[in-house]
Amino acid sequence: MPVLGAVPFLKPTPLQGPRNSPGRQRRHTLPASEFRCLSPEDAVSVFEIEREAFISVSGDCPLHLDEIRHFLTLCPELSLGWFEEGRLVAFIIGSLWDQDRLSQAALTLHNPRGTAVHIHVLAVHRTFRQQGKGSILMWRYLQYLRCLPCARRAVLMCEDFLVPFYEKCGFVAVGPCQVTVGTLAFTEMQHEVRGHAFMRRNSGC
C-alpha cells in the first residue's frame, strides 16, 4: 500500500449508488473516474482485490466474501469505491461500532446506534498501486464521513508496518488492539470526525 506525504486537495462530491439507468450518460461511455458507495453486486470484485492484496502478506483476508456481502447489505453508505472507466480499482468498507475500543465482535458486527466508523479494509488493485490511490481514497472517505450525522470518529486496526501510512492520513495510534487473528497482532488507530462544523459548511453536505 503506497504512502503519500501529502494528498492533493480534492473537493468531495456527493456519493451515489450504482448508476443503472443508461439514459444518464451516453451509450458505451463510462466516467473516467468515479467515487460511489458500493452495493452487494460489487462484492465479488471487492473480494478479488482484497484476496490478492492480503493473502500474500498476511495469509488471510480481513473480510471473506459472505462478510463483504453482509456489510454491503446492512450499511452500504459506509463503503466507498473508486472506479476507473467502470472498473473497481480501490475500495473501503466500514460499519458502525458503539464501544471506545475495538473487540473481536467488531470484526462481524454493525451497530446502527454506534458513532464510531470501524474501517474493516482498504485495498487497491495491484495494477493501480504505487500511485497514491490508497491515500486519496482514505482522504475522500474521511471527508464523506464528516457529512454523516452518526459519525464521530473513524477507527481501524492494522499491522505495525502500516502505522506510518495511516498516520500520514491523520490517524493516531491509541495502543495495541484487543483483536487478534491467528498469530497476528494489531495496533488500534483512530481519527476524530466530530467538531468539523467548518468543513461541513464548506463541503456541500
From Swiss-Prot:
What factors induce this protein? Exhibits circadian rhythm pattern in the pineal gland with highest levels at ZT 24. Expression in the retinal photoreceptor cells oscillates in a circadian manner.
Q: Which family is this sequence assigned to? A: Belongs to the acetyltransferase family. AANAT subfamily.
Q: How does it assemble?
A: Monomer. Interacts with YWHAZ; the interaction requires phosphorylation on Thr-29, and modulates the enzymatic activity of AANAT through preventing dephosphorylation and/or proteolysis and stabilizing substrate binding. Subsequently, a second molecule of AANAT can bind, via the phosphorylated Ser-203 site, the other ywhaz monomer with similar effect.
The record, for PROSITE patterns, names: GNAT
Outline the extent of the N-acetyltransferase domain.
Answer: 33-194
Q: What keywords are assigned to this protein?
A: Acyltransferase, Biological rhythms, Cytoplasm, Melatonin biosynthesis, Phosphoprotein, Transferase
Write down which residues bear the modification named Phosphoserine: 203
Q: Where is this region: Disordered?
A: 11-30
Q: Name one GO molecular function term.
A: aralkylamine N-acetyltransferase activity
Pathway note: Aromatic compound metabolism; melatonin biosynthesis; melatonin from serotonin: step 1/2
The molecule here is called: Serotonin N-acetyltransferase
Record organism: Gallus gallus (Chicken)
InterPro entries, sorted: Acyl_CoA_acyltransferase (IPR016181), GNAT_dom (IPR000182), SNAT-like (IPR051635)
Reactions mediated catalytically: a 2-arylethylamine + acetyl-CoA = an N-acetyl-2-arylethylamine + CoA + H(+)
Task: Report, as the record phrases it, the tissue specificity of this protein.
Answer: Expressed in follicular pineal cells and retinal photoreceptors with five times more expression in the pineal gland.
E.C. no: 2.3.1.87
